[in-house]
Amino acid sequence: MKKIAKIVLVSFSLLIFIIAVLIFRPVPIVSENKAISESGIVKEIYSNKGNDVIFVMENNERRFYINRGLENGLELNNLKEKLIGNAIVVKYPNYWTPLDWNNSVRHISKVEFNDEILFNELKK
């Protein structure tokens, strides 16, 4: 019986470790040719307590965010004035995390508007 309990405990510990690794691994920084590209008309832009800049696009269930965008020099009011109602292209890495199991929130690696790059953290 002790052997079974030990196996269960080791298995459970390993499972918890794997889940923790999946949750806490950083978002990968990819090159542009490996990024997924999506375009749409910006419906809403807002920020959260973590200083992320969040984009909501028309006819798209996903939200897109720039991690700590306000800390990296982006101005929320300027983005709203420039982008709401206009088409943008966002590029993001293909990754999965248990915290967002259905991929409803995507980390933006690049934002383009009218051939202007507003944000870019893709590998060169």
Residue positions per predicted region:
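Hydrophobic membrane-insertion alpha-helices, especially the h-region
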Residues: 6-23
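Structural detector for short beta-strands of small beta-barrel domains
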Residues: 31-50
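Positively charged n-region of N-terminal signal peptides that target proteins for export
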Residues: 1-4
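A short, sequence-level motif marking secondary-structure junctions
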Residues: 66-73, 123-124
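Short nucleic-acid-contacting surface segments enriched for D/E, G, S/T with interspersed K/R
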Residues: 73-91
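Short boundary/loop segments of OB/S1/cold-shock single-stranded nucleic-acid-binding domains
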Residues: 19-36
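OB-fold (S1/OB) nucleic-acid-binding surfaces
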Residues: 49-69
